[in-house]
């Protein structure tokens, strides 16, 4: 065993040896290793520290060895804060998201006026248009009233859906009423009629309506405008046909497809 033997320490007999092998250990202990008992034979083990734990091992030939295990306060503090922060943040965001989702679901299922967006189309009408056609009591339910100012083809994405139609038209005439009519191709009369007014200056005349889609094939609509019983109407122009403020003006027609809600 090399440098080994017995010696008397105070009143006790001691055995000493270097490079000793214990049990079935196959290698001598190395720096900072200890002998660790197991359920079978002893093994060589090394103590290590994990997050938040400090480990100090003192061992030399001239002094008693020591192993000091303590708490690394700064690392432990930061570790705890990080863990608590993650849990608090996850809890708050999870609660907010779940609450928001539930509010939306409740709104959709309880509000019969709310629909789901499917498709959106927007058409611009630019340039000046003179509308000489009139709307009268005899032609308002036919396809002869007013003057056509635009045709719009839209394709539904779902059968049984509806289009919310919004037409905002800049119209001028010598003081009097303005009539707007939306016509669906194939119909024998307008599917929606609206009224506006101009006192000789440009005014925004609007038509708001909804139309039901019976299928998912492209459908064409036309918008007709004319004076109420009398008068010439100008679109995107002054009542005398001149440009408004010397610039080109634009009117808009939009179609928004929705699916009506059915509460049961």
UniProtKB/Swiss-Prot annotation:
The keyword Nucleus does not apply. The keyword Cell cycle does not apply. Keywords: Plasmid. Gene3D superfamilies: 2.60.120.1340, 6.10.250.3190, 6.20.30.20. It comes from the Bacteria. InterPro entries: Chlamydia_pGP3 (IPR008444), PGP3-D_N (IPR049000), pGP3_C (IPR033758). This is Virulence plasmid protein pGP3-D. The lineage of its organism: Bacteria, Pseudomonadati, Chlamydiota, Chlamydiia, Chlamydiales.
